[in-house]
């Protein structure tokens, strides 16, 4: 049989080669190649993916695993990762939460980084500490991250030394352990708002070691376990045979490997090997479960399924990737199917894959429809009918998305032609390599060549068949390891299991004709029109005034009030950048019509050059539109291209033809969002957010009544008025183009834009101003545990002047205040998990700034903690808390985060317009001004904020 198959393959190849000599029609050639490819699928599936040869990996005599990969990127940074097998599932009953507790203690002092030196070292390297950005504990592992560190040799050595300390030399003083207990409690408190989501995940895991244990642990254990219990857990499991060191970045791999061997080689091998992760419990029939959600007014019907294990293909082969890609594709197909079922009763649809626990082979898929609570039966039945119909009948060619990309194959299409990527530094980003390596260590999988793996995935995606999709779907929805989850708003009574089961049973008994949804042709959105297909022949405007500013720049004021700026500047490929900015934006809409701001782009769109699409972008205080033209030669085609671009400007700016289908979709989305926002807890949260503002009308979502009044008819009225005046608009033409030659076209298409006697202007509303008196507000909400979300807003508007130096001071204030808050109310007092500090400033609509501090805490301590925060801010302004080291850390962080500047035309053109319209250009990454910040200048800036601004304190609390 094998010989016959090989002979048949050879014959096919000969036929194909002969045909290629005779006929070179590309379409026929592609068809023949596709036929050959499908004939050889079984052979390609067995092809082994080459192992990676670029990662230096090994295991020391003591059992510690290391991975080092040189990976050059423009930022020249290095990512360090310390991995430990065994998360919360290896805890004993009296240790629930200790694995996570140990993770916290790694930042409270080690042998070579005592006290707070670990956090201080990270700060000096520009790395922020807090939340899960530096470490996190999972069910089966713990990870410590030192990402984007400088490739300085001293920093590299220090990072390796810190990871060595984490491996065996954490100090864990009794005093530090006691101070960290409440921090963990506060972290747990902040997560309880998502408790119902965790309960839903547990239904999929359905295994005691995962359901009964959670990484954050039991708070009774966290509060009362002895320091000895914590230290014993650390010594028992933090042993070399359970650990790995990963270094990826701009380093010399050989040098780093040598340093790892020297630094970690003398650690003693332990006796405690983390056992394999327990297998999940299997259920042969679906389970029906009910949950309450206090954050949504909607009901959700969901089918949650654990993906079947796939043991058919040999690991490390191309075929081993097929199941993964089939299910990924299946998820996308189901999203399309469910989205097509949305109507007045079904307001939400979702299809997604998830990995609830970091265990190899455990993945889930969810299909979900949302409705109003009274329509729960309709939602469940619709979902069940669609799933049952597809289970019986499978997918069609129309359902399957076509993938155009194929990898390269060998000449006879019997194998993928894998490119040689040996020792290629620039293949893949640091994060991609770290993820690949981490999975290899925890799951025991081999490291495969990254480019070859992606080529294999391309092959799989391009050869997925409807039969494979249908078979995978049937296995997925056969009822095994499936949960039917019905989630209702808090306070709504659950139906019975029998009611749900009866609906599912009735659907199973339906005939195909009953299962098939009546197909109604969806209304179509307006098609984009080519500008040459539209009669565009406006009456040209005239020149009112010409001003020559210098040899490169001249300004021309047109009769309709548009100012045209010609900037003679040589761009690549004879490029011409044209950019229009109207200084109005949707600030012109009244409070009552503000919700239509999201629909102003729902108009007929135009294109030129067959593929160039663009639309007017309505922003809060500007309406912008820009295009770029280029040509190898300044010939007739060059000028045709420029005229078509200018036609695009005219057509796009003047059309009032509303796309009613697109607008209706946004209106429906807005109405659903209004219903979602009607929940008491959401409204309370929004009121706290709006506390500093004079008015919340343009900041809060619309009410259900307001959203119900939205209409396409009113949008049409607004669009006609909104695009009726371009007096005061700036139009920039940048490029090496002759002004006299292009002027007639500019007069015809820009000079003819509609205008009114008065130029446009930016409007101010109540929501654009901060309150001028201090305020305090308390809002109540429900939560499974006592919780208070506190927000302190320091605002300054009257007398505030914004320039680049002030922006640098605001950036520094955010960094320094954030560090001091972390040190004071988390590290020293243990009152909160991680406070967040954000400083924002605005030039428009009025110069102003806001310093927002937020955190979660125990409701009974909210006033005391808020007073501590206020006292800290006052001490910063009056004392010596702002040190040079804190400012230096801020500057290093700015340098680390700054992206390399890419020369181009967009930046200079935007700067010119911003300077012309706003009088100043403000950058977010001006290191020159950042480096001018000093402790004294920052202190003086904060004093002004406290003296001239106001303070607004909001508590969102359960009691």
Model regions and ranges:
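His/Glu-rich zincin catalytic helix
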Residues: 5, 20-120, 158-161, 165, ...
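Bacterial Sec-dependent N-terminal signal peptides
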Residues: 1-23
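Charge-rich, well-structured scaffold segments of protease-associated domains
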Residues: 20-36, 59, 120-274, 301, ...
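Hydrophobic alpha-helical membrane context
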Residues: 14-15, 112, 198-199
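A ubiquitous, low-specificity "background" feature that marks scattered single residues
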Residues: 8-9, 106, 201
């Amino acid at each position: 049989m094998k010989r016959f198959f090989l002979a048949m393959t050879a014959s096919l190849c000969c036929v194909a080669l002969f045909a290629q000599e005779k006929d070179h029609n590309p379409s026929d050639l592609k068809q023949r190649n596709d036929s050959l490819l499908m004939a050889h699928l079984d052979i390609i599936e067995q092809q082994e993916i080459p192992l990676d040869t670029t990662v230096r990996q090994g295991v020391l005599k003591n059992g510690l695993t290391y991975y080092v990969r040189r990976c050059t990127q423009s930022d020249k940074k290095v990512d360090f990762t310390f991995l430990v097998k065994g998360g919360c599932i290896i805890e004993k009953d009296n240790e629930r939460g200790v694995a996570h507790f140990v993770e916290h203690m790694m930042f409270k002092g080690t042998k070579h980084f005592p006290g707070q030196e670990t956090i201080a070292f990270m700060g000096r390297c520009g790395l922020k500490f807090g939340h899960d950005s530096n470490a996190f504990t999972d069910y089966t592992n713990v990870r410590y991250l030192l990402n984007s560190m400088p490739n300085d040799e001293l920093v590299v050595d220090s990072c390796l030394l810190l990871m060595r300390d984490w491996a065996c030399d954490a100090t864990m003083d009794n005093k530090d352990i006691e101070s960290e207990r409440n921090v963990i409690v506060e972290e747990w408190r902040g997560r309880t708002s998502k408790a119902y989501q965790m309960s839903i995940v547990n239904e999929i895991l359905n295994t005691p070691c995962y359901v009964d244990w959670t990484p954050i642990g039991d708070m009774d254990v966290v509060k009362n376990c002895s320091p000895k219990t914590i230290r014993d857990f650390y010594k028992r499991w933090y042993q070399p045979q359970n650990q790995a060191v990963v270094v990826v970045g701009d380093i010399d791999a050989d040098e780093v490997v040598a340093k790892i061997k020297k630094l970690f080689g003398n650690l003693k091998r332990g006796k405690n090997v983390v056992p394999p992760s327990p297998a999940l419990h299997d259920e042969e029939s679906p389970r029906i479960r009910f949950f309450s959600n206090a954050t949504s007014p909607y009901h959700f019907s969901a089918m949650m399924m654990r993906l079947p294990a796939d043991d058919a293909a040999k690991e490390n082969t191309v075929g081993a990737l097929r199941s993964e890609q089939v299910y990924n594709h299946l998820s996308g197909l189901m999203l399309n199917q469910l989205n097509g079922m949305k109507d007045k009763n079904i307001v939400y649809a979702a299809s997604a894959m998830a990995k609830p626990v970091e265990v190899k082979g455990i993945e889930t898929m969810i299909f979900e429809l949302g409705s109003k609570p009274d329509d729960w039966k309709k939602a469940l039945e619709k979902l069940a009918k669609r799933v049952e119909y597809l289970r019986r009948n499978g997918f069609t060619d129309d359902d399957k998305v076509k993938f155009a990309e194929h990898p390269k194959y060998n000449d006879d299409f019997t194998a993928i032609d894998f490119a040689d990527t040996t020792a290629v530094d620039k293949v893949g980003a640091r994060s991609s390599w770290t993820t690949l390596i981490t999975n290899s260590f925890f799951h025991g999988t081999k490291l495969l060549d990254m480019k070859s793996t992606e080529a294999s995935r391309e092959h799989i995606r391009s050869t997925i068949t409807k039969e494979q999709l249908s078979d995978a779907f049937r296995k997925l929805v056969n009822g095994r390891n499936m949960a039917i989850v019905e989630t209702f708003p808090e306070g709504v009574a659950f139906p019975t299991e029998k009611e749900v089961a009866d609906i599912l049973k009735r659907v199973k008994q339906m005939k195909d004709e009953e299962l098939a949804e009546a197909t109604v042709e969806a209304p179509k959105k307006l098609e984009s029109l080519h500008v040459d297909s539209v009669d565009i022949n406006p009456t040209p405007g005239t020149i009112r005034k010409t001003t020559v500013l210098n040899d490169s720049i001249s300004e021309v004021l047109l009769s309709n009030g548009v100012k045209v700026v010609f900037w003679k500047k040589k761009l690549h490929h004879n490029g011409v950048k044209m950019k229009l900015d109207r200084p109005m934006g949707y600030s012109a809409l009244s409070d009552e019509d503000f919700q239509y701001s999201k629909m102003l782009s729902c108009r007929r769109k135009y294109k030129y050059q067959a593929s160039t699409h663009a639309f007017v972008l309505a922003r809060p205080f500007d309406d912008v539109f820009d295009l770029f033209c280029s040509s190898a030669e300044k010939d007739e085609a060059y000028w045709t291209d420029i005229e078509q671009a200018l036609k695009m400007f005219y057509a796009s700016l003047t059309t009032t033809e509303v796309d009613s289908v697109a607008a209706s979709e946004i209106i429906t989305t807005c109405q659903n969002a209004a219903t979602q926002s009607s929940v008491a807890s959401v409204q309370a949260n929004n009121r706290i957010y709006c506390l500093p503002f004079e008015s919340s009308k343009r900041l809060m979502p619309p009410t259900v009544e307001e959203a119900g009044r939205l209409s396409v008819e009113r949008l049409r009225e607004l669009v006609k008025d909104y695009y009726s005046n371009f007096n005061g608009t700036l139009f920039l033409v940048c490029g090496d183009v002759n002004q006299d030659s292009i002027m007639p076209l500019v007069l015809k298409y820009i000079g003819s834009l509609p205008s009114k006697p008065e130029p446009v202007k930016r409007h101010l509303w109540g929501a654009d101003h901060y309150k001028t008196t201090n305020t305090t507000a308390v809002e109540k909400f429900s939560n499974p545990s006592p919780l208070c979300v506190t927000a302190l807003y320091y605002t300054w508007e009257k007398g505030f002047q914004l320039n680049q130096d002030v922006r640098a001071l605001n950036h520094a204030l955010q960094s320094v205040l954030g560090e001091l808050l972390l040190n004071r109310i988390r590290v020293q007092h243990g009152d909160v998990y991680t406070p967040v500090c954000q400083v924002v400033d605005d030039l428009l609509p009025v110069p102003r700034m806001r310093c927002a501090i937020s955190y979660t805490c125990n409701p009974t301590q909210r006033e005391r903690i808020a007073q501590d925060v206020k006292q800290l801010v006052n001490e910063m302004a009056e004392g010596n808390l702002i040190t040079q080291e804190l400012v230096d850390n801020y500057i290093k962080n700015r340098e680390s985060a700054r992206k390399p500047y890419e020369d181009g035309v967009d930046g200079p053109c935007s700067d010119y317009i911003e300077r012309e319209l706003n009088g100043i250009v403000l950058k977010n990454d001006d290191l020159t001004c950042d480096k001018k910040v000093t402790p004294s200048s920052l202190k003086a800036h904060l004093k002004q904020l406290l003296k001239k601004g106001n303070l607004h304190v909001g508590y969102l609390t359960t009691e």
